[in-house]
């Protein structure tokens, strides 16, 4: 099958970009042809985070460049829209994208990565895209996107697809796949080469990523135990004004982490956006990696973030929010993550962080136990969200519904 992939928002360097990178790897490894088109009408802070050398970047606002995308998309068997232009894109870009929707002739798949209605409202031409799509994917069949689809199409947005002649549209849940084995082969270090005193949080300057909880854990538990905590991914966005009021920290957002001397018994060190490949190399050398995101149950279903997966792939001990484990269902075991055995994960409870610290401390003193834990985490999350399962499942749904 030949697939045309559209990144209407452009290369924003976050989840959708990572999804596209992993998606195209899976397509290539499984005998599919693909071409990726991305808008370059708007520039993003993290645009250099990933290698996107295989992406055709176009000015959507220019009709002659949009013509190239329309022609290329119509030469494919299916068109997958990974993201839409934002309402902040130039008006000409949005209008040309709408022309694209009207002039393409092949089946359309729309993958909506946003969770909440606030994020969904930032998408331009979303109603036109939903109505044009033959297949719709979302992180959850009960999230705000499902409600939006119901409001647009008059259907419930749940369950199996209805018969074609009813024009009913429902949401199919998806998980963003990643090639666990390939990432492990590139970054995983012997346990002797990991530094148990180093603790690394990765995320963005948005509150649901859990930076408040990381500050608390460092200030009240890790710092006095001789740990060094680094944050990576913090931008000086409007949300940074609130971020900097939460706790004291060593701010180095515009500096290279390699040039900073990290010392014990210090406030956490805070660094800015990263190049993914360089970050993964740094992660692979620390003892504990923190992904402390938390979303409401209706947004999650089975989906974990790419940064959850990357920690498990890199060979560190993953520390995740306990409440996330209580809300997310394992793809294979069909149980909440927290209720599964041998997760290899430290679950951090917002209300009582002592048990997580006790386990972190115990692991830091026992390299054999630590190695067993990270191996368990790798296998557990690979079975949950490896691309060999998730993208195969997605493609099966696409083939059955176009």
Regions of interest found by a model, annotated:
Residues 15, 351, 364-399:
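A charged, aromatic-enriched C-terminal amphipathic alpha-helix characteristic of glycosyltransferases
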Residues 119-170, 178:
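A short, active-site helix/loop in glycosyltransferases that binds the activated sugar's phosphate group
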Residues 6-13, 21, 26-73, 234-240:
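N-terminal strand-loop element at the rim of the active site
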Residues 290-310, 319-332:
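Nucleotide-sugar-dependent
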Residues 242-283, 288:
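Nucleotide-activated donor-binding/catalytic signature segment of Leloir-type glycosyltransferases, i.e.
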Residues 137, 171-176, 184, 189-209, ...:
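Conserved donor-binding/catalytic core segment of Leloir-type glycosyltransferases
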Residues 7-21, 88, 206-209, 298-302:
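A short, glycine/small-residue-rich beta-strand->loop->alpha-helix junction that serves as a flexible
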């Amino acid at each position: 099958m030949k697939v045309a992939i559209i990144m209407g928002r452009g290369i924003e360097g976050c989840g959708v970009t990572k999804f596209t990178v992993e998606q195209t790897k899976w397509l290539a490894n499984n005998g599919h042809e693909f071409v990726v088109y991305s808008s370059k009408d708007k520039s993003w802070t993290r645009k250099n985070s990933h290698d996107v050398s295989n992406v055709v970047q176009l000015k959507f606002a220019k009709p002659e460049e949009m013509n190239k995308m329309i022609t290329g998309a119509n030469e494919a068997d299916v068109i997958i829209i990974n993201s839409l232009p934002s309402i902040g894109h130039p008006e000409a870009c949005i209008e040309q994208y709408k022309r694209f929707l009207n002039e393409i002739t092949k089946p359309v798949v729309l993958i909506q990565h946003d969770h909440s209605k606030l994020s969904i409202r930032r998408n331009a031409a979303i109603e036109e895209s939903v109505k044009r799509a033959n297949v719709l994917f979302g992180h959850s069949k009960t999230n705000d996107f499902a409600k939006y689809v119901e409001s647009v199409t008059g259907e419930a947005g749940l369950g199996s697809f209805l018969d074609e002649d009813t024009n009913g549209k429902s949401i199919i849940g998806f998980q963003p796949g990643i090639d666990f084995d390939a990432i492990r082969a590139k970054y995983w270090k012997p346990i002797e080469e990991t530094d148990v005193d180093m603790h690394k949080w990765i995320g963005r300057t948005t509150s649901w990523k859990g930076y408040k909880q990381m500050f608390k854990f460092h200030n009240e538990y890790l710092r006095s135990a001789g740990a060094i905590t680094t944050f990576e991914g913090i931008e000086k966005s409007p949300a940074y004004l609130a971020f900097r009021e939460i706790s004291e920290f060593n701010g180095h957002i515009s500096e290279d982490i390699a040039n900073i001397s990290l010392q014990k018994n210090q406030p956490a060190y805070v660094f800015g956006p990263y190049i993914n490949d360089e970050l993964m190399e740094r992660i692979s050398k620390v003892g504990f990696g923190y992904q402390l995101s938390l979303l409401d149950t209706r947004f999650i279903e089975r989906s974990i973030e790419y940064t959850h997966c990357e920690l498990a792939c890199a060979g560190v001990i993953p520390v995740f929010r306990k409440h996330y484990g209580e809300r997310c269902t394992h793809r294979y075991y069909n149980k909440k993550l927290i209720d599964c055995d041998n997760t290899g994960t430290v679950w951090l409870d917002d209300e009582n962080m002592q048990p997580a610290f006790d386990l972190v401390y115990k692991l830091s003193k026992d390299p054999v136990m630590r190695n067993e834990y990270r191996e368990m985490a790798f296998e557990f999350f690979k079975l949950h969200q490896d691309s060999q399962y998730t993208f195969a499942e997605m493609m099966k749904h696409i083939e059955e519904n176009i």
